[in-house]
Amino acid sequence: MKRLCVFAGSSKGSKAAYAEAARALGAGAAQRGVGIVYGGAAQGLMGLCADAALAAGGEVIGVLPQALSDREIAHPRLTELRIVGTLHARKATMAALADAFVALPGGCGTLDELFEAITWRQLSLHAKPIGLFEVEGYFAPLLSFLRSAADEGFVPRATLAAIAVRSEVPALLDSLLHE
């Protein structure tokens, strides 16, 4: 795996564990020689993940829509910053640059990115591994919903089985590398 696409909150959330997880993921990926592709902002969990990867000597590519770039939220120290026209182009560019996807805790934008990656895999538009970095049960309600949707016949069981859910960086990265 050359690059990992990280979906993460643009805020830090309410628990220190979220920030710790973002830093651990960035540093852990860099220590394994895995670059990070992400939304390009300096703030929130996404910024913390990028900072940690950069501090560990890793490659970090940010992909930022022009509208957000105009608000001056771009991370100033990235290996590379790509400015794209739309949020749709951002997701497509991140997917094209990455070999796997991981979601950290986040809000609607993070879930939008995650669900698009899951949907593309379900439709066989890619076969890239997808992981959730489970931090203090953050994704438990989402996983419960997905199991319910599968029980009701709306989500294939194979889609659920394709999502690696781990609470430690080494186990998460190992699961993505060995899928």
What are these regions (language model features)?
Residues 1-97, 114, 135-179:
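A cross-family phosphate/adenosyl-ligand binding-site feature
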Residues 54, 121-128, 154-155:
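Arginine/glycine-rich "motif VI" loop of SF2 helicases in the C-terminal RecA-like domain
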Residues 104-105, 129-133, 160-163:
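Flexible, glycine/proline-enriched loop segments at strand-loop-helix junctions
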